[in-house]
């Protein structure tokens, strides 16, 4: 669908499936400010769940509910945003990659801090009508990340509170001086409560209540009932859980923070013939950056001079250094090998590949998975419901029985039903899991993508660029009618001289001939026709040109997995050229691993059936669909999806419709490819296909941990409430069980951050074409 606003402005819906739309804008003055205006305007449309504008590629991605709004309403809002005056653009910072002021990983770190402390500031995170925080009421984390337990202020206070509480017990037993005992208990209560009461009161003043509010009420109630020791014990135990949560959160984020070291603070640039050291933030597009052996690249660029082997393991997760030379694109954070490089800067430090990747992840965090939505749906109304239930228990019990007994039980029920462990059950797992995956070159865009990835049962693999490396080479030339190998290649190269098609590149690389044909015309779906030395020459697929006496040889080429093209001059066949895009060396291993894991594997390709079948056999794939156009792939993926959760793996460009049609789109080799990263839900940054089963297994394990955490949290609440109501457990016992549960949930969630790197480079199988 295309909407023309005027002669210059045009909106094109690139993909629209599963409540996710991607719109390409042309003719816009698409800068950072306009991105803010688009996000603000489109975000106000009823039914729009999240929106993100990308100035770099002039595209907008929208998640919306089809039942509430349609494509026309969204496009209309984008058009309206294009006319918003600059002075009327909202004052908040754009979430677009071209206007980032935080560090490369800082925004995702900030997000995880907000998520795990219950403070959400991004759009769609907190509807305006909410009055309840899902998570514990915690203060903002300290600027300096604690690396040891004793560095956490809340744990230091908890320890001091515990010492005072222990001293009160010793004093009561050895020296029954009650003023001293009460003083120690009161001091223990004050120190422990200082970790959560101030923030709870602050949030209460803002009209929000959370678990900290429940604990504050319970502590005050215990004091009112004369149970100072119970109140002090509650404050001590809850302060421990608060401190442990902060420590676990910091520990989880430290893995992400380590990525900051990938980008050096300084870079050497060549200005006016002199090498000058400047801050990385001062680099400009067009600068000539000098990178010496052992140094990291400060930003993205293109090599102008020099050759080396780059270590990109920290970015792509691949351990084998990549050989690069003049004209090759290089990325921020890569480590230079032995050579000295002169690199032309193509992106600023704030807009390099690492910054864009982290930014996109941060922007997509508003998309919660099913487990997080379930936890939120339970936790948000649970807190005020608990307060109402506790008030009813206290009131009814006071009328029918002993008021002191029932008020105390109401306070215990208040604490027993607190959903603190439930609220952190999923976020801590998501942050740990996504952070671990990103360190190995797997970009997972938010909790929703992580959970969906964990439910996938079928995988559709595109052939070109996914199963193969998209680097075809000429592997055989058959001749006839007296033509030579060089003559056949020369005619083919003449027709392909001005083409950038991968097959053309392969043919041109196989010959030294440089003469280009004239009057070259493309015949869609067939081949090329032109004139060379006054004679008519043609190049095309079998069927358009008659293979004649080379039919058997052409069949042999196709059975070997090669694409065969025929060459003809003056209606006389000269020969056949076999061009093969080799399977990735790890393809068969990956397919075998997927099938062992219970995944249904299907190959999709636009190539002919014979070639597709041959390559599929080499890879071990049984289900093959060939001669597909992009829209055919999308339709086929939709059919697979109707049967079971399906992931589509492609390059993210030609496969955009299929990626959008799947439950989950996975882009292969997405490093430096904006469209691939924007289109897919998961991006494999490197070229090693073994990251695919690694990501699937990691997500499946992470989802299991989420389910375990949510199940345990709900079970504990379900068990504790009746025990508290009937007086079987007291306040201290309930708090102890709750905080022990929270420790288990945190520790279990952190396990999602464990992922093993790939073991060495893939083995290269020996493949030859039959003679």
Swiss-Prot record:
**Reactions this protein catalyses:** ATP + H2O = ADP + phosphate + H(+)
Q: InterPro entries this protein is in?
A: ATPase_P-typ_cyto_dom_N, ATPase_P-typ_P_site, ATPase_P-typ_TM_dom_sf, ATPase_P-typ_transduc_dom_A_sf, Cation_Transport_ATPase_IB, HAD-like_sf, HAD_sf, HMA_dom
- HMA domain residues are 19-86
Catalytic residues, chain numbering:
462 (4-aspartylphosphate intermediate)
Q: Which GO terms describe its cellular component?
A: membrane; plasma membrane
Single GO term (MF)? cadmium ion transmembrane transporter activity
Q: List, alphabetically, the Gene3D superfamilies matched.
A: Calcium-transporting ATPase, cytoplasmic domain N, Calcium-transporting ATPase, cytoplasmic transduction domain A, HAD superfamily/HAD-like
- What is the first-listed, main subcellular location in coarse terms? membrane
Its family? Belongs to the cation transport ATPase (P-type) (TC 3.A.3) family. Type IB subfamily.
| Protein name per the record | Probable cation-transporting ATPase G
Organism, per UniProt? Mycobacterium tuberculosis (strain ATCC 25618 / H37Rv)
């Amino acid at each position: 669908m295309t909407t023309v606003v005027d002669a210059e402005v045009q909106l094109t819906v690139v993909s629209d499936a599963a409540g996710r739309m991607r719109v390409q804008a042309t003719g816009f003055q698409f800068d950072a400010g306009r991105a803010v205006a688009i996000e603000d305007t489109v975000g106000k449309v009823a039914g729009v769940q999240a929106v993100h504008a990308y100035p770099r590629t002039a595209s907008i991605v929208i998640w919306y509910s089809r039942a509430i709004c349609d494509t026309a309403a969204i496009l209309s809002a984008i058009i309206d945003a294009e006319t918003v005056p600059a002075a009327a653009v909202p004052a908040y910072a754009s979430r677009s990659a071209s206007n980032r002021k935080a560090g490369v990983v800082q925004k995702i770190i900030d997000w995880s801090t907000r998520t795990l402390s219950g403070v959400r500031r991004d759009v769609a995170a907190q509807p305006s009508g909410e009055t309840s925080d899902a998570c514990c009421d915690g203060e903002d984390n300290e600027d300096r990340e604690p690396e040891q337990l004793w560095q956490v202020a809340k744990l230091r206070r908890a320890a001091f509170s515990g010492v005072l509480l222990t001293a009160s017990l010793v004093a009561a037993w050895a020296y029954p001086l009650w003023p001293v005992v009460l003083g120690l208990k009161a001091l223990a209560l004050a120190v422990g409560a200082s970790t959560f009461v101030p923030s709870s009161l602050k949030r209460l003043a803002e009209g929000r209540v959370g678990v900290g509010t429940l604990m504050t009420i319970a502590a005050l109630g215990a004091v009112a009932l004369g149970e100072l020791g119970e109140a002090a014990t509650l404050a001590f135990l809850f302060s421990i859980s608060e401190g442990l949560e902060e420590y676990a959160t910091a520990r989880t984020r430290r893995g992400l923070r380590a990525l900051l070291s990938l980008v050096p603070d300084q870079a050497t640039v060549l200005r006016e013939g002199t090498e000058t050291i400047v801050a990385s933030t001062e680099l400009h597009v067009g600068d000539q950056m000098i990178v010496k052996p052992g140094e990291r690249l400060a930003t993205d660029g293109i090599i102008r001079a020099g050759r080396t082997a780059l270590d990109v393991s920290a970015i792509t997760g691949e351990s084998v250094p990549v050989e690069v030379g003049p004209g090759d694109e290089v990325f921020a954070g890569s480590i230079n090998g032995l050579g000295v490089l002169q690199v032309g800067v193509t992106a600023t430090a704030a807009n390099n590949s690492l910054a864009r990747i982290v930014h996109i992840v941060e922007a997509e965090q508003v998309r919660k998975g099913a487990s997080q939505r379930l936890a939120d749906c339970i936790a948000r109304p649970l807190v005020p419901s608990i307060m109402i239930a506790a008030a009813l228990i206290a009131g009814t019990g006071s009328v029918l029985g002993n008021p002191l007994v029932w008020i105390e039980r109401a306070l215990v029920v208040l604490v027993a039903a607190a959903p603190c462990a439930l609220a952190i059950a999923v976020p801590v797992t998501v942050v740990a899991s996504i952070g671990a995956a990103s360190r190995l070159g797997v970009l997972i865009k938010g909790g929703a993508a992580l959970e969906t990835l964990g439910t996938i049962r079928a995988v559709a693999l595109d052939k070109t660029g996914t199963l193969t490396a998209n680097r075809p080479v000429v592997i055989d030339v058959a001749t006839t009618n007296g033509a030579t190998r060089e003559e056949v290649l020369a005619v083919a190269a003449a027709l392909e001289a001005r083409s950038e098609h991968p097959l053309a590149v392969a043919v041109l690389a196989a010959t030294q001939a440089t003469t280009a044909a004239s009057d070259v015309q493309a015949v869609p779906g067939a081949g090329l026709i032109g004139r060379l030395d006054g004679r008519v020459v043609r190049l095309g697929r079998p069927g358009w040109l008659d293979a004649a006496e080379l039919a058997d040889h052409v069949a042999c080429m196709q059975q070997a997995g090669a694409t065969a093209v025929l060459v003809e001059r003056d209606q006389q066949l000269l020969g056949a050229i076999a061009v093969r895009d080799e399977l990735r060396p790890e393809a068969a291993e990956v397919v075998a691993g997927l099938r062992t894991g219970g995944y249904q594997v299907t190959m999709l390709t636009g190539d002919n059936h014979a070639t597709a079948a041959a390559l599929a056999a080499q890879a071990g794939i049984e289900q093959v669909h060939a001669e597909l156009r992009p829209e055919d792939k999308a339709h086929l993926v939709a059919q697979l999806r109707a049967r079971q959760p399906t992931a589509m793996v492609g390059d993210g460009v030609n496969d955009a419709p299929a990626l959008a049609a799947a439950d989950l789109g996975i882009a292969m080799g997405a490093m430096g490819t904006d469209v691939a990263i924007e289109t897919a839900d998961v991006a494999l940054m490197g070229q090693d296909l073994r990251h695919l089963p690694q990501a699937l297994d990691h997500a499946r394990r992470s989802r299991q941990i989420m389910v375990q955490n949510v199940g345990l949290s709900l079970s504990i609440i379900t068990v504790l409430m009746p025990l508290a109501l009937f007086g079987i457990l007291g306040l201290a016992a309930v708090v102890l069980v709750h905080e022990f549960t929270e420790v288990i949930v945190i520790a279990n969630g952190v396990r999602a951050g464990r992922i093993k790197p790939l073991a060495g480079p893939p083995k290269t199988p020996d493949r030859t074409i039959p003679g």
